[in-house]
């Protein structure tokens, strides 16, 4: 059984629907999964890339703020970086949700958000606002028995608050060509290989299923003009990147591009009307 993601409510619903308990994760396993899915786990990967000084990468200056007020620093210049603004991230949320942007000082709204996060989750992640150019992700699959496989890339779009807005449907070869306008291909492959090895060490025997690592291309004030932040977020579940990768493989002609997004409509009739319009305007063949 492989739902989009696991939580106690999904487990309960499946039991009620007749799925045998032996085919479902135990409550203890779900607790462990929840901890592995927390945003704070990306800090270990940040430290790995930072201390190994992997070329053409960025993303240092992040920390975990815990309920007792302690901060786990990743970079000594964290305070200076935060002068240009920072973003606070809930330990558990998805699709760009659970973010609090602090661009104009520590206002009451920001303070209230932090207080709620500490009360509800005992902590949150704090990081600088990076000068992002574009978003993308690397997708993997863990078999739960020690093997973690690279599935492919995905490119996606977010709004100015970091919320997910859709995917660009394109091939892996096109992504590798696209990324070379920012970093050398050899550096990109090194980043991918190091991430795959680190993920295999962390998850290959304790998690089975798809996982995606959100990354972004950032402008640099010093050194290389552009660098990759390779550990923005680790999505320990099925995700839109996997879906868009499958759609691209099956429905986009070689060398072509498409868009994948989710729209909401007030009625079934409105949805059907839009669907028929799109079928005529953007036929698959």
Each PLM stretch: what is its role?
Residues 110-165, 216-231, 235, 239:
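Phosphate-binding site of ATP-dependent enzymes
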């Amino acid at each position: 059984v492989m739902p989009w993601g696991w939580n106690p409510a999904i487990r309960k619903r499946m039991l009620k629907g007749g799925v045998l308990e032996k085919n479902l994760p135990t409550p203890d396993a779900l607790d462990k999964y929840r901890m592995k899915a927390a945003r704070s786990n990306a800090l270990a990967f940040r430290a790995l890339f930072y201390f190994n000084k992997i070329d053409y990468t960025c993303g240092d200056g992040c920390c975990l703020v815990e309920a007792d007020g302690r901060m786990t620093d990743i970079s000594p210049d964290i305070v200076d970086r935060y002068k240009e603004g920072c973003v606070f991230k809930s330990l558990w949320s998805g699709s760009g949700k659970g973010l609090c942007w602090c661009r104009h000082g520590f206002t009451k709204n920001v303070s209230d958000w932090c207080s709620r996060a500490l009360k509800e989750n005992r902590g949150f992640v704090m990081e600088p606002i990076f000068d992002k150019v574009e978003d993308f992700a690397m997708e993997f699959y863990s078999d739960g028995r020690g093997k973690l496989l690279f599935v492919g890339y995905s490119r996606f779009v977010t709004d100015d608050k970091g919320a997910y807005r859709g995917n660009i449907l394109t091939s892996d070869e096109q992504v590798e060509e696209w990324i070379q306008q920012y970093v050398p291909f050899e550096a990109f492959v090194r980043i991918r290989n190091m991430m795959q090895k680190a993920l295999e060490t962390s998850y290959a025997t304790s998690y089975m299923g798809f996982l995606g690592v959100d990354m972004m291309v950032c402008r640099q004030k010093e050194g290389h003009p552009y660098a990759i932040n390779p550990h923005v977020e680790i999505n320990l579940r099925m995700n839109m990147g996997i879906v868009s990768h499958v759609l691209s493989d099956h429905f986009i002609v070689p060398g072509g591009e498409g868009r994948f997004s989710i729209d909401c409509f007030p009625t079934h009739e409105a949805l059907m009307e839009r669907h028929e319009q799109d079928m005529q305007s953007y036929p698959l063949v």
